[in-house]
């Protein structure tokens, strides 16, 4: 297969924030960023799991500010570019300016997969500020491939130089991934790049990333030991091993990625980042991966099987930004459970 070199973005220091409650310390950020830079990744994404300015009661407070994390990563990177995510309505154009001044060169403007229109102002502003700008269609499994093409074309028209399919729920199959990249091929100009951001909830992140590359993706998101929301992202060390077997060109060193994953990242996981009964249910139900910790807390508080909460979230089609409604789901399920209990007294 003849193709251009893959551009690998590691998201351990952004999506990986979800896996540890946004609690990296400064030293961990320096260590991980330095190891990634040494291992040859093209870009390192840094910041709160929900993007610039995401630290809040609703999404979870970071141990340190986004700018602090960016400064730490910038202090040790010599080759890799630094990247961030911004969700309109959470991050602002002023946040973009501060991120640029702190060393960020690439920004991904992320919206729900049916709401690309809300990215117009932020994409155009980011282009004017000199960033390489990507549109990021979150929860791409939650709409049709045809609509993905429509939404991607909107982002392109606002100035995005790349559009990512983000399988935030880890719900896509290889066939579903193929269909969405075929839709991008039909909708986008040939000069607009395509990217893939996969999650592991159905154990398909590497397979879906491979299929995406075979269908035109040249920008690939992955994380050390899969560090990310839910069952995690596409594990970078596994994907690079597969890319080597395919003969695809990239700049990464496999053993250095393996060492960073095992020595630096896995020891930080207070909850193993893996496919288990909870994270598998996220993928099965098509639920936003970063809802996992919120659902687990609600399940503990109300003594409900977290899988029931996740399934109900899926039925209600909650999307990112509706984390506060998870408690409502748990309350409703607890009330129903109480009403069905044979030991109920009154």
Swiss-Prot record:
Superkingdom of the source species: Bacteria
E.C. number: 4.1.3.39
Keywords: Aromatic hydrocarbons catabolism, Lyase, Manganese, Metal-binding
Keyword hit for Nucleotide-binding: no
Site (Transition state stabilizer): 14
InterPro entries membership: 2-IPM_HCS-like, 4OH_2_O-val_aldolase, Aldolase_TIM, DmpG_comm, DRE_TIM_HOA, PYR_CT
Gene Ontology BP terms: catabolic process; L-leucine biosynthetic process
Catalytic reaction equation(s): (S)-4-hydroxy-2-oxopentanoate = acetaldehyde + pyruvate
UniProt-annotated catalytic positions: 18
Binding-site residues for substrate, renumbered to this chain: 14-15, 168, 197, 288
Lyase among keywords: yes
Domain called Pyruvate carboxyltransferase: residue spans: 6-258
Binding site for Mn(2+): 15, 197, 199
GO molecular function: 2-isopropylmalate synthase activity; 4-hydroxy-2-oxovalerate aldolase activity; manganese ion binding
Entry-linked PANTHER family: 2-ISOPROPYLMALATE SYNTHASE 1, CHLOROPLASTIC-RELATED (PTHR10277:SF9), HOMOCITRATE SYNTHASE-RELATED (PTHR10277)
NCBIfam families in the record: 4OH_2_O_val_ald (TIGR03217), PRK08195.1 (NF006049)
Family, as annotated: Belongs to the 4-hydroxy-2-oxovalerate aldolase family.
Protein name: 4-hydroxy-2-oxovalerate aldolase 1
Organism, scientific name: Mycolicibacterium smegmatis (strain ATCC 700084 / mc(2)155)
């Amino acid at each position: 297969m003849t193709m251009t070199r893959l551009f690998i973005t590691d998201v351990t220091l952004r999506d990986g924030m979800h896996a540890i409650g946004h609690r990296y310390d400064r030293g961990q950020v320096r260590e991980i960023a330095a190891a990634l830079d040494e291992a040859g990744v093209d870009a390192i994404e840094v910041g709160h799991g929900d993007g610039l300015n995401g630290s809040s009661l609703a999404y979870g407070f970071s141990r340190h500010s986004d700018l602090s994390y960016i400064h730490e990563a910038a202090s040790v990177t010599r080759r890799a570019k630094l990247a961030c995510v911004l969700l309109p309505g959470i991050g602002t154009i002023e946040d973009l300016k501060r991120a640029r001044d702190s060393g960020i060169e690439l920004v991904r403007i992320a919206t729900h997969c049916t709401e690309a229109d809300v990215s117009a102002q932020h994409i155009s502003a980011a282009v004017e500020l000199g960033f390489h700008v990507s549109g990021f269609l979150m929860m791409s499994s939650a709409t049709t491939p045809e609509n993905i093409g429509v939404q991607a074309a909107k982002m392109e028209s606002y100035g995005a130089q790349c559009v990512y399919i983000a399988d935030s729920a880890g719900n896509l199959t290889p066939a579903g991934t193929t269909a969405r990249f075929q839709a991008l091929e039909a909708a986008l100009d040939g000069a607009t790049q395509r990217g893939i951001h996969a999650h592991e909830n159905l154990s398909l992140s590497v397979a879906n990333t491979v299929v995406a590359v075979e269908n035109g993706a040249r920008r690939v998101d992955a994380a050390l030991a899969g560090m990310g929301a839910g069952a995690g992202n596409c594990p970078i060390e596994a994907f690079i091993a597969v890319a080597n077997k395919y003969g695809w060109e990239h700049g990464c060193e496999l053993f250095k990625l393996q060492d960073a994953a095992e020595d630096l990242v896995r020891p930080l996981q207070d909850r193993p980042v893996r496919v288990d009964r909870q994270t598998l249910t996220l993928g099965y139900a098509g639920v936003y991966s970063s809802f996992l910790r919120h659902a687990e807390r609600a399940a503990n508080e109300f003594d409900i099987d977290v899988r029931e909460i996740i399934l109900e979230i899926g039925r209600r089609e909650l999307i990112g930004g509706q984390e506060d409604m998870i408690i409502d789901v748990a309350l409703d399920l607890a009330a129903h459970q109480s009403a069905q209990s044979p030991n109920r007294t009154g």
